[in-house]
């Protein structure tokens, strides 16, 4: 038993050593211009905490830049669309896009048309919903848009956009999250109304990917600890590269115009971009409680004060110990699109709200974002 444990410990050490060595070799050879590898070579402890256990943290990264020929160049690290990770609230970006596309099918409806949803007396608008989604990552407006669209429409749209491996199964943090029946919505236009009746959606096939069974336990809906792996086969999924490609359609529109199949007007894209750059204060939240950098993890995950000359348009998500972000970072010298995902769950128990977000994930994202800006601008 002692010999076996020594072997396991040595194997883990060697695996970690070989991984770090591979980064150094790649950064010094054919991949020497890859800003991701250069950033991951950093001696900063915020970076090293993740790199020293990269498999455990399931780190994936994509960085896209505009080169001197005005073409998009993609740099990738550790991507594998067949390995499941939980995308959390980053799924709200495509859902927001699809909601805008759907209202375009109805000329009388726009983002400011008030609407009500079944069993709710309040009025809402698509504009306010998307602002709340992008800035505060609130689940209620996402769930309303989910009711507006339905699973079948969402998954059809994902395929239409070339997001072939992406699947959306459920609402977020609500009872009956996987209910295949959507609620009725009513839009109010002057003296008339447009009703969207309940839709009855076909059940989506479970995911067939690697790493769908995770951890050593999870907290169930009753609050009990179940001592077995958590099954993610019917959880929302968007491969990081598919999410990133959607971001490129928004932020590198000129360069990606041949691939662009977004059915949005320039005004709608401008609205969406602005929404992804708003501060909590700009949509009515107290700036002392919610600082301007509240929804930014890349660059700002460990600081609150904005840095002059940097604008970030982004969508973050974190749940079950997974943290992800897709962002467009604009400085006076560069334009960078970054998408990144990682996991921090030391005890391997899911749904217990004991994750190392503040200690490990957020500082890593902040430092990585700053490193990338520094590396890109030094070239």
Go through each PLM region and give its residues:
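Extracytoplasmic
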Residues: 56-58, 74, 80-82, 86-90, ...
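Active-site-adjacent helix/loop patches that line small-molecule binding or acyl-intermediate pockets
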Residues: 34-43, 122-252, 256
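Active-site SXXK
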Residues: 85-111, 338
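A short, well-structured edge-of-sheet supersecondary motif
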Residues: 41-81, 338-340
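Short glycine/serine- and small hydrophobic-enriched flexible loop segments
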Residues: 97-105, 135, 139, 245-252, ...
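Short, well-structured active-site flanking segments
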Residues: 101-128
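Bacterial Sec-dependent N-terminal signal peptides
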Residues: 1-35
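Structured C-terminal helix/loop/strand segments within mature extracytoplasmic catalytic/sensor domains
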Residues: 30-48, 228-379
């Amino acid at each position: 038993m002692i010999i076996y444990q020594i072997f396991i410990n040595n194997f883990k050490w060697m695996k970690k050593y070989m991984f770090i060595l591979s980064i150094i070799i790649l950064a010094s050879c054919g991949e020497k211009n890859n800003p991701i590898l250069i950033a991951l070579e950093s001696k900063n402890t915020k970076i090293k905490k993740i790199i020293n256990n990269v498999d455990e943290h399931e780190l994936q990264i994509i960085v896209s830049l505009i080169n001197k020929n005005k073409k998009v160049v993609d740099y990738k690290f550790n991507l594998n669309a067949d390995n499941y990770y939980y995308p959390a609230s980053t799924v709200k970006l495509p859902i927001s896009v699809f909601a805008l596309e759907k209202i375009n099918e109805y000329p009388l409806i726009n983002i400011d048309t008030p609407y009500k949803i079944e069993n709710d007396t309040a009025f809402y608008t698509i504009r306010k919903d998307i602002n709340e989604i992008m800035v505060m990552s609130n689940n209620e407006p996402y769930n309303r848009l989910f009711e507006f669209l339905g699973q079948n429409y969402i998954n059809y749209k994902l395929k239409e956009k070339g997001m072939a491996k992406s699947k959306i199964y459920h609402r977020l943090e609500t009872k009956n999250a996987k209910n295949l029946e959507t609620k009725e919505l009513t839009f109010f236009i002057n003296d008339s109304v447009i009703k969207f009746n309940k839709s009855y959606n076909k059940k989506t096939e479970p995911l067939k990917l690697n790493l769908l069974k995770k951890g050593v336990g999870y907290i169930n809906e009753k609050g009990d600890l179940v001592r077995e792996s958590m099954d993610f086969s019917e959880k929302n999924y968007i491969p990081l590269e598919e999410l990133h490609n959607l971001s490129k359609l928004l932020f590198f529109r000129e360069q990606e115009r041949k691939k662009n199949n977004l059915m949005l007007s320039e005004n709608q894209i401008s609205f969406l971009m602005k929404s992804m750059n708003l501060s909590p204060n700009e949509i009515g939240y107290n700036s002392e409680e919610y600082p301007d950098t509240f929804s930014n993890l890349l660059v700002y995950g460990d600081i609150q004060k904005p840095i002059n000359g940097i604008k970030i348009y982004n969508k973050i998500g974190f749940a079950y110990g997974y943290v992800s972000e897709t962002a467009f970072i604009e400085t006076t010298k560069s334009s960078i699109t970054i998408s990144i995902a990682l996991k921090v769950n030391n005890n391997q128990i899911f749904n217990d709200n004991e994750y190392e977000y503040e200690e490990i994930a957020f500082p890593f994202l902040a430092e990585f974002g700053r490193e990338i800006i520094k590396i890109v601008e030094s070239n």
